[in-house]
């Protein structure tokens, strides 16, 4: 069985982009209520893949944490520490995306979005591999 499948990717895209309102998108990193409502609506398409409460709770909970606390930026910063010491940068020297401040904003935002999506897909894959 594949770890991440096309139906999981489709459920992720529908939940994270089609069902997410502008209010959820702009407020989820500032307010737990917005992040919680987004996490619940995000989880709805996964009802087509599983009815297992543990899988759905894991998908919802990890989505809440990743989005509310922008966990992808820490992953980005950590991966960029795997460089020679003269290239690495301290957390205070990073932008809100986790990249160095001299990286063009358009690039750092898109790379953060990609990292965020990969984190979600990995968490969903774990949940559905264990509890599907």
Predicted regions: what they are:
Residues 1-132:
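Hydrophobic alpha-helical transmembrane segments
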């Amino acid at each position: 069985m594949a770890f991440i499948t096309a139906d999981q990717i489709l459920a992720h895209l529908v939940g994270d982009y089609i069902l997410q309102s502008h209010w959820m998108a702009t407020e989820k990193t500032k307010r737990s209520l917005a992040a919680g409502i987004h996490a619940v609506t995000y989880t709805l398409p996964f009802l087509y893949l599983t009815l297992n409460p543990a899988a759905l709770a894991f998908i919802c909970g990890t989505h809440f944490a990743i989005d509310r606390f922008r966990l992808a930026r820490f992953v980005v910063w950590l991966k960029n520490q795997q460089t020679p010491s003269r290239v690495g940068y301290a957390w205070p020297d990073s932008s809100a995306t986790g990249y160095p401040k001299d990286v063009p904003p358009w690039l750092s935002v898109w790379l953060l979005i990609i990292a965020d999506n990969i984190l979600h897909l990995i968490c969903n894959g774990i949940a559905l591999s264990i509890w599907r």
